Design a protein with these regions (language model features):
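Acidic anion/phosphate-binding donor-loop and adjacent secondary structure
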Residues: 2, 165-168, 177-199, 239-240
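Membrane-proximal helix-turn-helix segments that form the acceptor-binding/catalytic region
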Residues: 42, 86-94, 137-156
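Conserved catalytic-core segment of nucleotide-activated headgroup transferases in glycan assembly
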Residues: 197-242, 248-254
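Conserved acidic donor-binding segment of nucleotide-sugar-dependent glycosyltransferases
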Residues: 207, 307-318, 327-333
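Short acidic/histidine- and often glycine-rich active-site loop of Leloir-type glycosyltransferases
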Residues: 239-240, 298-312
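Nucleotide-sugar-dependent
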Residues: 255, 269-284, 298, 302-303
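Acidic donor-binding loop of glycosyltransferase active sites
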Residues: 261-276, 291
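A charged, aromatic-enriched C-terminal amphipathic alpha-helix characteristic of glycosyltransferases
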Residues: 333-365
Length: 385
């Protein structure tokens, strides 16, 4: 990786979806209304200031009725919020590098670049989450249009090695990099040895579309000695109506969220096959809080945690969940060992938001360093003249 010293910070613009306005987020975070182990600003990108970046976030700007109608129309046609990017175009175009969190944002930025073709464009680090899971579902015309845009990204980044592999096969001429996701790991509570509750306290959390709730519910229905609490907007009360040992949580504050982890003996994350490391955020949150984890082995999660740190199971089989849950219920030492090793992994800092932001800073510096020789040559020519 090239490392170049700059006389001033790299100007970074983080373009996120509507609802992630930095100022509004910070107010909600301070009030404990951002659910999860989060940062004072979304995803901790601001931490790149420690690595020579001046970071600013996109703003949710008020739209009048006509703009709202236009934005909805464009969104229905192209599938991304171009108007949101347009309203942030000034700071996008005056930055050195634009960072995005998902394909929804970077595709909008690439469309903006195409529409402002006469303007200088900054570098773009384009992070992918769901796009390559869905790639085969797009029409030929859709894949062609996406490829036309993606070819103009400076770097495609991925939270999963599985996603990375798929992208490199489709876009061999575009630079693709694995950037491990990380959460705020500044405060990690001491891990306590404790006996399992009776009935066993089981927690499952998440809203990702690749959660396999039917399999988990089927597994827990057959385990009357376990009590499952689910924190998800994707599960309806009617789905658990016949399960007296399953409860839906209505979590409205971060204190309630953390209390659910403190209540749990184990966390279970049942997943459908995917490429994008579905579940990684909640796995890291559980590791920080010292909760042992059972998780489906899919999506490239082993790049984050090994089977020394997580009890991995095959997917699409409720019996495998039952075996894992009962194995951990009967073995206090195994639960403690898994939780301790996973927590040590988080303490290493390699899966922290600080490391995640630093990797973005390194990639940005590398992109800009590639321009330095030509800029220097141009300056030399002007000086000689």
């Amino acid at each position: 990786m090239s490392v170049t010293k700059y006389s001033k910070p790299i100007r970074v613009f983080v373009h996120l979806a509507k609802g992630f306005d930095g100022r509004r987020w910070e107010k909600r975070w301070a009030a404990g209304q951002i659910i999860g182990i989060n940062e004072r600003l979304p995803y901790g990108y601001f931490r790149a200031a420690e690595d020579g970046c001046a970071v600013c976030y996109s703003e949710d700007k008020t739209k009048n009725k006509l703009e709202h109608l236009l934005g909805s129309l464009i969104m229905s046609i192209v599938g991304v919020d171009v108007l949101h990017a347009w309203r942030n175009r000034s700071r996008i175009c005056t930055s050195d590098v634009v960072w995005t969190h998902t394909e929804i944002e970077y595709l909008a930025v690439l469309l903006l670049f195409r529409s402002l073709f006469w303007k200088r464009r900054p570098k773009l680090i384009a992070q992918n989450v769901w796009l390559f899971d869905r790639w085969q579902s797009f029409s030929g015309a859709g894949r062609f249009a996406l490829s036309w845009l993606i070819a103009k990204a400076d770097i495609l980044t991925f939270l999963s090695l599985e996603n990375l592999k798929a992208a490199r096969s489709l876009f061999p001429n575009v630079r693709c990099e694995f950037v491990p996701f990380g959460i705020n790991a500044d405060e990690i509570p001491a891990l306590m040895r404790k006996k399992a509750h009776r009935p066993l306290h089981v927690l499952s959390v998440g809203n990702d579309p690749h959660r396999d709730w039917p399999i988990l519910i089927a597994a827990m229905r057959g385990l009357p000695d376990c009590y499952l609490k689910i924190a998800s907007k994707k599960v309806k009360a009617k789905e658990i109506a016949s399960c007296p040992n399953i409860e839906l949580l209505n979590i409205s504050s971060n204190d309630q969220f953390l209390a659910a982890f403190d209540w749990a003996d184990i966390l279970v994350v049942a997943l459908k096959p995917n490429l994008h490391a579905s579940g990684i955020t909640v796995l890291q949150e559980a590791a920080v809080r010292g909760v042992p984890i059972v998780c489906t082995d899919t999506g490239g999660l082993r790049a984050y945690f090994s089977d020394e740190e997580i009890y991995y199971i095959p997917g699409n089989n409720p019996v495998e969940i039952q075996i894992a849950v009962m194995t951990l219920a009967a073995d206090d030492e195994l639960r403690f060992a898994l939780a301790a090793r996973a927590q040590e992994r988080m303490k290493s800092g390699l899966l922290s938001s600080r490391c995640y932001a630093r990797r973005h800073a390194e990639l940005s510096r590398d992109l800009l360093a590639q321009e330095t020789p030509s800029r220097a040559a141009e300056l030399a020519r002007k000086t000689a003249a």
